[in-house]
Every structure is written in C-alpha cells, then in structure tokens.
Amino acid sequence: MNKLILLIVLFFSTFVFALSEDAEQPIEIEAESVMVDDASGYNEFIGDAEVRQGSLVMTAEIIQVQTNADGVETMVAKGTLEQPAKYIQSQENQARFIEATAVLITYDVNEGMIFLVGDAYLVQGFDSFSGDTLTYDINNDKVLVKSSEDGTKRVKFTIDL
C-alpha cells in the first residue's frame, strides 16, 4: 500500500507550469463591443470576446478585465452551459496545452490561480478533471475539484497513460 501511495505522489509531483514568457507578452482583446471605466480599472468586452497573451487564449460571450496601476489583476470569462467559457495555454516542457471550460472562468493573474465554476472541465497533459467547481493553482501545479452540493455532478479524474 505504501508503495502505491509513493508511486502516486511521484506521478503527480512532476511539475507542469504555464509558459512564464506569456506574462511578458502584450494582452490583445477582441469583442463586438467594449465598456471601459479608467477610474475603476474595470473593462467589459461583450460579444464573442477573446483575450490573447502569448500562448494564453480565453474566449467567452463576455470577458471582464480588472486592472490596477501594475497591470491586469483578474480576467473573468462568462459563458453558458451551451457555450462555455474557454481557457487554453501552453505548458513548459509539455507538448500539450492546458485546456479548461466552464460556465464561469476567473483567472487571478497575481496569484496564478484559475477558478472554474459550473460544469468545470480541465485537461492537463494527458489527464483530465471534471466536476462542478475546479481550482487550478498554476504556480504550484495543484488541482482541486469539487462535486455539486446536491450531489448530481460528481468529480471525475481520468489518467491517460
């Protein structure tokens, strides 16, 4: 049993990080319309919105970007069950992308955290996670998935060896 636990810990201790160069790239945003409030740093992009920064791509019907004097704090992508928000980014030392979908995706740039709410799904390398909510710590390569409170949406983890 201890050997199995050690094997699992070793398997999951392989660190996979998003590309560090992405943070140094300019952010490009496209949408059908935009609302900008310079005083508060709140920006809302509506209608087939897309954010690009290096290999990072977020798409949704609505994307909200909160900025401060240092730059972007958070990006929130709002989709629906029928057309979820999407997040894609290259990973260091990996041929595959991090891919995520959910009704609501919040990317906390400063903390390096991605929060998925509502039919959350994440593919990292050859592994996939799904549940009602999902938290992905980019900097520490940790995933926390939770089932729905009513128990209708259980957590699922798939390892593709």
Model features per residue range: what roles?
Residues 1-8, 13-161:
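Mature-chain termini and adjacent capping regions
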